[in-house]
Swiss-Prot record:
Catalytic reaction list: a quinone + NADH + H(+) = a quinol + NAD(+); a quinone + NADPH + H(+) = a quinol + NADP(+)
SUPFAM superfamilies (UniProt xref): Flavoproteins (SSF52218)
E.C. designation(s): 1.6.5.2
Gene Ontology annotations of biological process type: positive regulation of potassium ion transmembrane transport; potassium ion transport
Annotated function: Regulatory subunit of a potassium efflux system that confers protection against electrophiles. Required for full activity of KefB.
Gene3D superfamilies: 3.40.50.360
The name this protein goes by in its record: Glutathione-regulated potassium-efflux system ancillary protein KefG
Broad class of enzyme this protein falls into: oxidoreductase
Pfam families with a match to the protein in the record: Flavodoxin_2
Main subcellular location of this protein, as a coarse class: membrane
Organism annotation: Salmonella typhimurium (strain LT2 / SGSC1412 / ATCC 700720)
Alphabetical list of InterPro entries matching this protein: Flavodoxin_fold, Flavoprotein-like_sf, K_H_efflux_KefG, KefG/KefF
Amino acid sequence: MSQPAKVLLLYAHPESQDSVANRVLLKPAIQHNNVTVHDLYARYPDFFIDTPYEQALLREHDVIVFQHPLYTYSCPALLKEWLDRVLSRGFASGPGGNQLVGKYWRSVITTGEPESAYRYDALNRYPMSDVLRPFELTAAMCRMHWMPPIIVYWARRQSPQTLASHAKAYGEWLANPVSAGGY
Protein backbone atom coordinates (compact mmCIF):
# COMPACT_ATOMS: atom_id res chain seq x y z
CA MET A 1 0.00 0.00 0.00
CA SER A 2 1.44 3.37 -0.99
CA GLN A 3 1.73 6.32 1.33
CA PRO A 4 -0.82 9.14 0.95
CA ALA A 5 0.44 12.34 -0.62
CA LYS A 6 2.02 14.84 1.76
CA VAL A 7 -0.28 17.84 2.16
CA LEU A 8 0.77 21.34 3.19
CA LEU A 9 -2.32 23.18 4.40
CA LEU A 10 -1.62 26.90 4.34
CA TYR A 11 -4.23 28.43 6.62
CA ALA A 12 -4.71 32.18 6.37
CA HIS A 13 -7.36 33.84 8.51
CA PRO A 14 -6.58 37.10 10.33
CA GLU A 15 -9.38 36.50 12.86
CA SER A 16 -9.24 32.74 13.21
CA GLN A 17 -10.71 32.79 16.70
CA ASP A 18 -13.94 34.24 15.26
CA SER A 19 -14.30 31.81 12.35
CA VAL A 20 -16.38 28.86 13.46
CA ALA A 21 -16.47 27.40 9.94
CA ASN A 22 -12.70 27.46 9.43
CA ARG A 23 -12.04 26.02 12.89
CA VAL A 24 -14.47 23.16 12.15
CA LEU A 25 -12.78 22.52 8.79
CA LEU A 26 -9.33 22.44 10.43
CA LYS A 27 -10.26 19.75 12.97
CA PRO A 28 -9.96 16.76 10.61
CA ALA A 29 -6.80 18.17 9.04
CA ILE A 30 -4.83 18.08 12.27
CA GLN A 31 -5.71 14.41 12.73
CA HIS A 32 -3.92 13.24 9.58
CA ASN A 33 -0.23 12.34 9.70
CA ASN A 34 0.18 13.28 6.03
CA VAL A 35 -1.07 16.85 6.61
CA THR A 36 1.05 19.76 7.85
CA VAL A 37 -1.20 22.61 9.03
CA HIS A 38 0.67 25.89 8.69
CA ASP A 39 -1.15 28.90 10.17
CA LEU A 40 0.35 31.90 8.40
CA TYR A 41 -1.13 34.54 10.74
CA ALA A 42 0.15 32.68 13.81
CA ARG A 43 3.63 32.34 12.31
CA TYR A 44 3.90 35.81 10.77
CA PRO A 45 1.96 38.36 12.85
CA ASP A 46 4.43 40.99 11.62
CA PHE A 47 4.04 39.92 7.94
CA PHE A 48 7.81 39.30 7.64
CA ILE A 49 7.77 36.04 5.72
CA ASP A 50 10.74 33.67 5.89
CA THR A 51 10.84 32.90 2.17
CA PRO A 52 13.55 30.17 2.25
CA TYR A 53 11.66 28.35 5.02
CA GLU A 54 8.37 28.55 3.13
CA GLN A 55 9.97 27.35 -0.09
CA ALA A 56 11.51 24.39 1.74
CA LEU A 57 8.05 23.48 3.07
CA LEU A 58 6.66 23.58 -0.45
CA ARG A 59 9.41 21.29 -1.73
CA GLU A 60 8.58 18.71 0.97
CA HIS A 61 4.89 18.40 0.05
CA ASP A 62 2.91 17.08 -2.91
CA VAL A 63 -0.41 18.87 -2.42
CA ILE A 64 -0.70 22.50 -1.38
CA VAL A 65 -4.04 23.53 0.13
CA PHE A 66 -4.83 27.21 0.54
CA GLN A 67 -7.57 27.51 3.17
CA HIS A 68 -8.92 31.00 3.77
CA PRO A 69 -11.98 33.20 3.76
CA LEU A 70 -12.82 35.12 0.61
CA TYR A 71 -11.83 38.75 1.30
CA THR A 72 -12.79 41.36 -1.29
CA TYR A 73 -12.88 38.77 -4.07
CA SER A 74 -9.43 37.52 -3.11
CA CYS A 75 -7.50 36.20 -0.12
CA PRO A 76 -6.47 37.86 3.15
CA ALA A 77 -3.53 40.27 2.89
CA LEU A 78 -0.91 37.98 4.45
CA LEU A 79 -1.66 35.18 2.00
CA LYS A 80 -1.33 37.63 -0.91
CA GLU A 81 2.05 38.72 0.50
CA TRP A 82 3.01 35.04 0.88
CA LEU A 83 2.08 34.31 -2.75
CA ASP A 84 4.12 37.28 -4.01
CA ARG A 85 7.20 36.50 -1.89
CA VAL A 86 7.31 32.71 -1.87
CA LEU A 87 6.20 31.85 -5.41
CA SER A 88 9.04 33.89 -6.79
CA ARG A 89 10.55 33.87 -10.24
CA GLY A 90 13.40 31.36 -10.34
CA PHE A 91 11.68 29.20 -7.73
CA ALA A 92 8.12 28.69 -8.95
CA SER A 93 8.19 30.29 -12.39
CA GLY A 94 10.47 31.69 -15.06
CA PRO A 95 13.93 30.37 -15.89
CA GLY A 96 14.86 27.67 -13.39
CA GLY A 97 11.52 28.05 -11.63
CA ASN A 98 10.51 24.43 -11.61
CA GLN A 99 10.21 23.62 -7.90
CA LEU A 100 6.42 23.19 -7.95
CA VAL A 101 5.98 21.46 -11.30
CA GLY A 102 3.52 18.59 -10.99
CA LYS A 103 2.37 19.43 -7.46
CA TYR A 104 -1.32 19.98 -6.74
CA TRP A 105 -3.07 23.24 -5.77
CA ARG A 106 -6.43 23.26 -4.05
CA SER A 107 -8.23 26.27 -2.66
CA VAL A 108 -10.58 25.75 0.29
CA ILE A 109 -12.59 28.91 0.75
CA THR A 110 -15.32 30.17 3.04
CA THR A 111 -17.60 33.00 1.96
CA GLY A 112 -19.95 35.36 3.72
CA GLU A 113 -22.61 35.10 1.04
CA PRO A 114 -24.74 32.33 -0.47
CA GLU A 115 -23.79 30.58 -3.68
CA SER A 116 -26.64 32.37 -5.46
CA ALA A 117 -24.78 35.68 -4.97
CA TYR A 118 -22.03 34.49 -7.34
CA ARG A 119 -23.72 34.76 -10.72
CA TYR A 120 -23.54 37.29 -13.56
CA ASP A 121 -27.02 38.55 -12.67
CA ALA A 122 -26.54 38.59 -8.90
CA LEU A 123 -24.91 40.66 -6.16
CA ASN A 124 -21.28 39.80 -6.98
CA ARG A 125 -21.78 39.92 -10.77
CA TYR A 126 -19.48 36.96 -11.44
CA PRO A 127 -19.54 33.24 -10.74
CA MET A 128 -17.02 31.89 -8.24
CA SER A 129 -15.00 30.30 -11.06
CA ASP A 130 -14.31 33.81 -12.40
CA VAL A 131 -13.54 35.22 -8.95
CA LEU A 132 -10.97 32.47 -8.37
CA ARG A 133 -9.34 32.78 -11.80
CA PRO A 134 -6.22 34.60 -10.42
CA PHE A 135 -5.50 31.61 -8.17
CA GLU A 136 -5.98 29.19 -11.05
CA LEU A 137 -3.63 31.28 -13.19
CA THR A 138 -1.05 31.35 -10.40
CA ALA A 139 -1.19 27.56 -10.19
CA ALA A 140 -0.72 27.39 -13.98
CA MET A 141 2.21 29.80 -13.78
CA CYS A 142 3.84 27.41 -11.29
CA ARG A 143 2.92 24.44 -13.53
CA MET A 144 0.86 22.91 -10.74
CA HIS A 145 -2.28 20.83 -11.18
CA TRP A 146 -5.35 22.94 -10.36
CA MET A 147 -7.89 20.93 -8.38
CA PRO A 148 -11.53 22.04 -8.16
CA PRO A 149 -11.87 24.36 -5.18
CA ILE A 150 -13.89 23.49 -2.11
CA ILE A 151 -16.23 26.37 -1.30
CA VAL A 152 -18.29 26.68 1.86
CA TYR A 153 -20.78 29.39 0.95
CA TRP A 154 -22.44 31.56 3.59
CA ALA A 155 -20.18 29.90 6.13
CA ARG A 156 -21.38 31.90 9.14
CA ARG A 157 -24.96 30.86 8.53
CA GLN A 158 -24.39 27.13 8.08
CA SER A 159 -25.81 24.82 10.70
CA PRO A 160 -23.39 22.85 12.88
CA GLN A 161 -24.56 19.70 11.07
CA THR A 162 -23.80 21.17 7.64
CA LEU A 163 -20.35 22.34 8.76
CA ALA A 164 -19.68 18.91 10.26
CA SER A 165 -20.64 17.31 6.95
CA HIS A 166 -18.22 19.59 5.07
CA ALA A 167 -15.48 18.82 7.61
CA LYS A 168 -16.05 15.07 7.31
CA ALA A 169 -15.83 15.16 3.50
CA TYR A 170 -12.77 17.44 3.69
CA GLY A 171 -11.07 15.08 6.15
CA GLU A 172 -11.77 12.08 3.93
CA TRP A 173 -10.29 13.92 0.96
CA LEU A 174 -7.19 14.94 2.96
CA ALA A 175 -6.53 11.30 3.86
CA ASN A 176 -5.83 10.51 0.20
CA PRO A 177 -6.00 13.78 -1.75
CA VAL A 178 -4.58 12.80 -5.11
CA SER A 179 -6.45 9.59 -5.81
CA ALA A 180 -9.61 10.74 -4.02
CA GLY A 181 -10.23 13.46 -6.59
CA GLY A 182 -12.76 16.10 -5.66
CA TYR A 183 -15.05 16.21 -2.72
